[in-house]
Amino acid sequence: MRKELQLSLSVTLLLVCGFLYQFTLKSSCLFCLPSFKSHQGLEALLSHRRGIVFLETSERMEPPHLVSCSVESAAKIYPEWPVVFFMKGLTDSTPMPSNSTYPAFSFLSAIDNVFLFPLDMKRLLEDTPLFSWYNQINASAERNWLHISSDASRLAIIWKYGGIYMDTDVISIRPIPEENFLAAQASRYSSNGIFGFLPHHPFLWECMENFVEHYNSAIWGNQGPELMTRMLRVWCKLEDFQEVSDLRCLNISFLHPQRFYPISYREWRRYYEVWDTEPSFNVSYALHLWNHMNQEGRAVIRGSNTLVENLYRKHCPRTYRDLIKGPEGSVTGELGPGNK
């Protein structure tokens, strides 16, 4: 009887020690990636399955709540896909701050299918037409470098690995059924805020060649939507859209503006208004919130019943619960290169 009691106490003690050990690890490393995620390399993660790609080309480490919502909504809509967030401020030796310091980053790192990687442009641009351009450029002297470096990186990543690139002010609401596609911002005009291709698609290779040949940092969008549009015109005979139907050209789909831009950039403030009857967005796959237009700092406010608050509540509920405050402590979506 005594031996059984001793054995029982020993087992209980071991269990308690194990629990305390795990608790200590979690308490001191709330921001760290789970071990099963930290050992997965980029190539292994993206080489055999499609993924969703986000970029942060500034040095900031704490994603604004709109970035958090974009990543969370993508992870929710594509639960079987890796959602990869490249961050310039993150390195292999970056010390992991506490949960209280960077709550959004900590939350995103804990989502099962979200993976955070350092943005190493030199490595990403290797074996592409952009590599020699990058080695010759003086980034500090370039206008709009954060946006241009983002434009270059997204082309190289999707060309190498395939998948879907999204700006960090895009809220996913349903899966995109296309493999090779561009998103129309308007008739005969393509955006580069969201696009998807299979690996090594020649359209993206030609885009990278044109990026270098016609590089001009003084022209806003020249390496971004203007590039996509002029290359699409080379590949396809563009026509006006008829109703809500997409255009097909070779093996590329040019998706109707309603798919991602049902509210145009001229009307971006409508996201921050209360609607009598909210739109269903039943033909849209994702919503681009035009955060770059939000120079006046319009905020997402808990309890406001604005369209954007209700989108957060439905499509990124954890971000809404943890990061969105009431009128006394409202926060805006900070501007960044990935939310144009």
Curated annotation (Swiss-Prot):
Entry function: Catalyzes the transfer of N-acetylglucosamine (GlcNAc) to core 2 branched O-glycans. Necessary for the synthesis of type III mucin which is specifically produced in the stomach, duodenum, and pancreatic duct. May protect against inflammation-associated gastric adenocarcinomas.
Pathway where this protein functions: Protein modification; protein glycosylation
Protein name (database record): Alpha-1,4-N-acetylglucosaminyltransferase
Glycosylated position list: N99, N138, N251, N282
Similarity comment: family membership: Belongs to the glycosyltransferase 32 family.
Organism name: Homo sapiens (Human)
Pfam family membership, one: Gly_transf_sug
Topology term for the membrane: Single-pass type II membrane protein
Expression by tissue: Detected in stomach and pancreas.
Ranges of the Cytoplasmic topological domain: 1-4
